[in-house]
Amino acid sequence: MKRRSFLQSLAAALPALPALAQNKRFRTSLAEWSIHRAIGSRMIDNLDFPRIAREQFGIEGLEFVNGLWAAPTQEYVAQLKKRMADTGTKGVLIMCDGEGLMGHSDRAVRMKAATNHRKWVDIAAELGCHSIRTNMHSDLKPSGNAEIEKVLDYCAESFNNICGYAAPAKINVIIENHGGISSDPDVVVRLMKKVNLPNFGTLPDFGNFPKEVDRYEAVKKLMPYAKGVSFKCYDFSPAGDETTIDVPKMMKVVNDAGYNSWVGIEYEGDRLSEFEGIAAGKRLLDRINA
């Protein structure tokens, strides 16, 4: 199916959802990863993201994924910015992967990783985003506390560097629980305290925790540093509830922390299509936010 035909069939098959009123407790954004399969199959591309979010789902906030972009050139960013202006959408953050290991044991390598993120700071500022999401990954696989502390020292140097670059542009640098030691909330909190900069924070993801970790307690630990929230969802019951995560319970954790900014839908399920999953997630968040 060609891209235009796909978009037309989508509009016919999935009625557009209403936009969320602005006086609610939080605002809903959409993580571009939710449509990564459609982009990967070339049914749509990154430039379609603003229109799909706004017209199909009534969502204003956009959470971009750098790996889904054609190229981070000035011309490409200008095209994307125009699409956003045309649809009345707003950049929230850019999820950045593949730019190097911020916790690498070789200082030259980790400083190169920090430098690699600078272009995304510039692009985030151009698109009106408040943050770039980075990773605290390393070439080391630390097991004991002393080894973890060493990796945290490496990460702290890298994040101090990129946060210093990002501060004049008023861009935050945020860490998601995204595999490795970042899936341990206590380790992430240690890094937050070690860097201790106002534009360094967390992006708590409702998923991405090992089975042995209590996800609700983990998110509670990350929320004091949160500059965004990722509503990971996998599947929904006939009643519209998420089947893996108790979302009302999780959103109580978020609300109790005093958070009232963007909550990004990130659908990663297989049973529903990407667009059906996003719509189900939007309906659930709207119900909670009513």
Feature annotation, model-predicted:
Residues L10-R27, R51, R83-C96, G100-P204, ...:
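Active-site acidic/histidine proton-transfer and metal-coordination neighborhood
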Residues Y76-D86, I162, A218, M250-V253:
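Catalytic-core regions built around general acid/base machinery
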Residues K2-G58, S182-A290:
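Histidine-acidic metal/acid-base catalytic patches
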